[in-house]
């Protein structure tokens, strides 16, 4: 297994994480006007934690996985988009998708300017591993299924 950081695009790896006042302030929650939050407590006046710390800690405990190895997203579309955006250089890399499958793989590849190579399932819906290997030898960066 490769070290995953070696697969990440260089410009993505060098990004500085977005920081909010909430990240920097550890005391009693005040009013975060820089985040355009409502100063009046009505139950919906705060944005949720952008790092999902509490949720990841709970999932970590339940599943026995380190919280830094857990990704939480806004559904599969976001996860697919991020995988292609993080690991594939636009107009350079390609990805492999098994077909028939979820249509968002193709849409996300087009949005990220990544060539998508589709490999058809066998007639019995088995994975054509030899075809996947052959297509993957020509510079595929990601296999999505």
State each model region's role:
Residues 56-94, 112:
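Phosphate-binding glycine-rich loop
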Residues 21-24, 83, 87, 131-135:
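CheY-like receiver
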Residues 1-62, 145:
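N-terminal "arm"/small-domain region of PLP-dependent enzymes with the aminotransferase-like
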Residues 50, 71-75, 100:
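Short beta->alpha linker loops
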Residues 11, 29, 69, 115-117:
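Conserved beta-strand segments of alpha/beta enzyme cores
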């Amino acid at each position: 297994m490769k070290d995953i950081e070696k697969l990440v695009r260089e410009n993505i790896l060098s990004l500085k994480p977005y920081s909010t006042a909430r990240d920097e302030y550890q005391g009693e929650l005040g009013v975060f006007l820089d985040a355009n939050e409502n100063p009046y407590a009505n139950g919906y006046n705060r944005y949720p934690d952008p790092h999902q710390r509490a949720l990841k800690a709970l999932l970590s405990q339940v599943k026995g996985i380190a919280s830094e190895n857990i990704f939480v997203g806004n559904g599969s579309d976001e996860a697919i988009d991020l995988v292609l955006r993080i690991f594939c250089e636009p107009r350079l890399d390609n990805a492999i998708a098994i077909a028939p499958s979820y249509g968002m793989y193709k849409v996300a590849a087009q949005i990220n300017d990544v060539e998508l190579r589709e490999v058809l399932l066998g007639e019995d819906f088995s994975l054509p591993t030899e075809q996947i290997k052959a297509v993957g030898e020509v510079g595929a960066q990601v296999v999505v299924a």
